[in-house]
Amino acid sequence: MALNSITYQKCFHTSAQQYADNKNKKVIIGMSGGVDSSVSAFILQQQGYQVEGLFMKNWEEDDDTDYCTAAADLADAQNVADRLGIKLHKINFAAEYWDNVFEHFLAEYQAGRTPNPDILCNKEIKFKAFLEYAAEDLGADYIATGHYVRRSADNENAQLLRGLDANKDQSYFLYTLSNQQVAKSLFPVGEIEKPMVRQIATDLGLVTAKKKDSTGICFIGERKFKEFLARFLPAQPGDISTVEGEIVGRHDGLMYYTLGQRKGLGIGGVKGLSEDPFYVVEKDLVNNVLIVAQGHDNSALLSTGLIANQLHWVDRKTIGDTLRCTVKTRYRQTDIACLVEPIDAENIRVIFDEPQIAVTPGQSAVFYQGEVCLGGGVIEAQLK
């Protein structure tokens, strides 16, 4: 398929006037060595922008040779930059990542919650440290990333929108952005679908064309999670108990489990109980007990709502009254119709139209009205 085909032109479409205006604007694209940022850089070029790349190293791997991916990712990013004829800057944000993301990540696990480091990483690194560095040190008018999201406008009222590809939409991870940050950010692949991204990369002959998507912890990579966490937090094994109080096994440490988890519990057949699988329904931090229940539809797994705090609204306005909208309590979840009620300036109560399974403290509740991501908060507690 030729890169000047009608199909591709839909990806790159820019009016003659906009193209001329773009030629005076500098964009720094965060290049991770993946296919999404690679194609994003190319699309920006086609839209007329002055494009330069930035590779961020945010994890020191001196003692981590088994999982050293940063060098390979940098090589891929440099290869793509050379292929596209753009400059690639390098920056080390490891100190910022440790102080502002990873220490919080550990503290949340230690407190028995299940955090989402990608959300905090976007807040503190990609759209704070990166944005500030690009603007102040590199003279950027915009930054760009390979996230599958869109924005509504190029001004202070910019809204964050879901990505065009519903299967890849990443707005859940970006709800902490303000409309000012959205206005200063470009998301080229948010306007197209993933198969087209890979097709463009293939036709360009980019080394990242067939590179698999990363699924590990933000910037740290794909590791054996239990072994990795044990290096930083001492495990405290304890009992696994049913909601009725019967001991049915031993756990390796509460931090290794999340609500709704079924696999990896190590509970065999228990005399007097059915063969239905066990699910984690609660963590008793005081007594170091993991509480389980049988059956996917067990009422112990269900929540009628949640309490959330650490709120971030994209327009940075607080909710003054009740709000009808939809919510996601985890990535890739189907939207849940709900009512949001302000408790005070820092806390909200969310009531689901239908009870939901495995609402997990530490994860984020992200709110939507149609295509617009309104913002969200961190789940503090379930409502039963």
Curated annotation (Swiss-Prot):
Pfam families linked: tRNA_Me_trans (PF03054), tRNA_Me_trans_C (PF20258), tRNA_Me_trans_M (PF20259)
Active site residues according to the UniProt entry: 121 (nucleophile), 218 (cysteine persulfide intermediate)
Keyword tRNA-binding on entry: yes
Stretch list, region Interaction with tRNA: 168-170, 330-331
Chain sites annotated for binding ATP: 30-37, 56, 146
Keywords: ATP-binding, Cytoplasm, Disulfide bond, Nucleotide-binding, RNA-binding, Transferase, tRNA processing, tRNA-binding
GO CC annotation terms, alphabetical: cytoplasm
Region (Interaction with target base in tRNA): 116-118
EC number(s) reported in the record: 2.8.1.13
Enzyme class: transferase
Biological process according to GO: tRNA wobble position uridine thiolation
Compartments, as annotated in UniProt: Cytoplasm
Annotated positions for site Interaction with tRNA: 147, 363
InterPro entries: MnmA-like, MnmA-like_C, MnmA-like_central, MnmA-like_central_sf, Rossmann-like_a/b/a_fold
Catalysed reactions listed for this entry: S-sulfanyl-L-cysteinyl-[protein] + uridine(34) in tRNA + AH2 + ATP = 2-thiouridine(34) in tRNA + L-cysteinyl-[protein] + A + AMP + diphosphate + H(+)
Disulfide bonds: 121-218
GO molecular function: ATP binding; tRNA binding; tRNA-uridine 2-sulfurtransferase activity
Highest rank taxon of the organism: Bacteria
Family: Belongs to the MnmA/TRMU family.
Function field: Catalyzes the 2-thiolation of uridine at the wobble position (U34) of tRNA, leading to the formation of s(2)U34.
Stated name of the protein: tRNA-specific 2-thiouridylase MnmA
Organism: Haemophilus ducreyi (strain 35000HP / ATCC 700724)
